[in-house]
């Protein structure tokens, strides 16, 4: 009889330990309201923006990150090939690098605009996003802010292209290419192209952080994040 009691006690204590572990991992799970959910998602997004976008603004943040590196548009790929074919590889390399430098510079100045867009999320949006897919928050931001961000981002990119000398480098490249016999003249809008790619890179890196916080418990660095994302763990 004593043996049976001891076995039951062991199981009971084991169960209590597991419950305590869950309680520590998911504190106050039952106390969440819409305001908590919205606050948690906004915290997660702001963390993602701060962490991932800061990587993009560093030197070579775009240029040496294969996930977001800005390559030449289709119209200019033939320019790149032609220049390399006549011994101007260094000029072609510089042309690619300055496009990425412009994006790195532009993202640094545009980030506060992007962060402010997070504040517009409603309670209903937050709850739907929380229980959605691994990139629901990023998709929501893309759909609700891209147009506004683009209109703000584009002039920053234009200024940045001028600041890093990309406009002059590419004016020189295009002039040399257009002077090659039997080629069709090109005149691409690099401002729009770099803006598109810079925004694409920002959203891609935010999506990386969103997936991480949804799937990696150690990425939930506050009690609020632990509580909020514990809900989606159980869906």
Show where each model-derived region lies.
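Sec-dependent signal peptide recognition
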Residues: 2-7
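Bacterial signal peptide processing site
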Residues: 17-20
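N-terminal Sec/ER secretory leader and immediately downstream segment
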Residues: 22-98
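Residue-level signature of catalytic and energy-coupling elements of molecular machines
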Residues: 52, 122, 217
């Amino acid at each position: 009889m004593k043996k049976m009691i001891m076995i039951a006690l062991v199981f009971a204590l084991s169960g209590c330990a597991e419950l305590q572990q869950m309680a520590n991992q998911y504190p106050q799970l039952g106390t969440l309201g819409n305001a908590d959910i919205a606050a948690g998602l906004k915290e997660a997004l702001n963390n993602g923006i701060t962490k991932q976008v800061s990587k993009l603004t560093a030197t070579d943040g775009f240029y040496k990150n294969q996930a977001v590196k800005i390559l030449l548009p289709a119209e200019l790929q033939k320019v790149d090939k032609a220049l390399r074919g006549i011994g101007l590889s260094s000029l072609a390399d510089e042309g690619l690098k300055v496009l990425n430098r412009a994006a790195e510079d532009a993202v640094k100045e545009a980030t506060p605009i992007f962060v402010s867009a997070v504040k517009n999320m409603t309670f209903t949006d937050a709850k739907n996003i929380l229980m959605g897919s691994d990139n629901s928050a990023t998709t929501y931001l893309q759909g609700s802010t891209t147009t506004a961000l683009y209109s703000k981002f584009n002039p920053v990119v234009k200024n940045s292209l001028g600041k890093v000398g990309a406009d002059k480098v590419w004016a020189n490249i295009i002039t040399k290419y257009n002077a090659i016999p039997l080629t069709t003249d090109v005149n691409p809008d690099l401002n729009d192209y770099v803006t598109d790619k810079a925004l694409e890179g920002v959203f891609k890196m935010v999506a990386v952080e969103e997936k991480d916080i949804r799937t990696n418990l150690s990425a939930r660095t506050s009690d609020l994040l632990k509580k909020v994302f514990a809900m989606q763990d159980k869906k």
